[in-house]
């Protein structure tokens, strides 16, 4: 079963009534809206991107936090969407959004041990990320709680302050900058130019 951005937003609002802390919903909305901006700009450059799907995936990526808990939200979100009958192309974002470079250890806040979740480790290693999924990877790393967009620099500092520094932190930071550069090169300009208000959050 497919999803539109409108339907994904309705899922979020339905969960707002049940969750203990709805800041994750604000974050999902920011990620989805920011993803739409980047996707539209890429389309204008002649790059094949599904704008509504990018927005949809952004809205859905943290749906596994519906119970107010961050721990385990990746698998919980995937199972939530699968149990509702939604296609893999939507459920997969719950698995992919936190991990860069096809590596479960390339994540913020210290990665899981690969042996702790063989399914997730194997999926991330072998999955061919779509451009929409890569956009969500980036936007997740630009959007804090609240309806804001940060530079990568500020957002990474925010993550380190909240989650701590670990043996994989340098690796994750390097891959984050590579991801932003990838989209800058596709656009032919600094993608921060798409977000005039980003300077307000410096």
Located regions from the model:
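Divalent metal-dependent phosphate-bond-processing catalytic cores, especially two-metal-ion Mg2+/Mn2+ enzymes
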Residues: 17-47, 60, 86, 106, ...
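An amphipathic alpha-helix signature
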Residues: 9-12, 32, 36, 78, ...
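Active-site flanking loop/helix segments enriched in acidic
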Residues: 4-27, 57-65, 100-104
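His-Asp-centered metal-binding catalytic motifs of divalent-metal-dependent phosphohydrolases/nucleases
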Residues: 31, 49-84, 91-102
């Amino acid at each position: 079963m497919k999803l539109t951005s409108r339907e994904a937003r309705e899922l979020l609002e339905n969960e707002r009534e049940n969750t203990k802390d709805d800041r994750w919903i604000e974050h999902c909305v920011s990620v989805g809206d920011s993803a739409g901006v980047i996707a539209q700009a890429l389309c204008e450059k002649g790059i094949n991107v599904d704008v509504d799907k990018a927005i949809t995936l952004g809205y859905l990526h943290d749906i596994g936090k519906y119970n107010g808990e961050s721990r385990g939200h990746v698998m919980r979100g995937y199972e939530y969407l699968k149990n509702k009958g939604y296609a893999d192309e939507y459920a997969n974002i719950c698995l992919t959004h936190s991990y860069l470079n096809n590596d479960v250890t390339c994540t913020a806040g210290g990665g899981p041990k690969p042996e702790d979740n063989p399914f997730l480790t194997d999926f991330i290693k072998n999955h061919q990320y779509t451009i929409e999924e890569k956009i969500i990877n980036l936007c997740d790393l630009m959007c804090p709680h609240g309806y804001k967009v940060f530079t990568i620099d500020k957002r990474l500092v925010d993550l380190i302050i909240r989650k701590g520094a670990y043996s994989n932190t340098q690796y994750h930071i390097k891959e984050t900058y590579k991801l932003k550069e990838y989209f800058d090169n596709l656009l032919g300009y600094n993608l921060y130019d798409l977000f005039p208000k980003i300077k307000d959050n410096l």
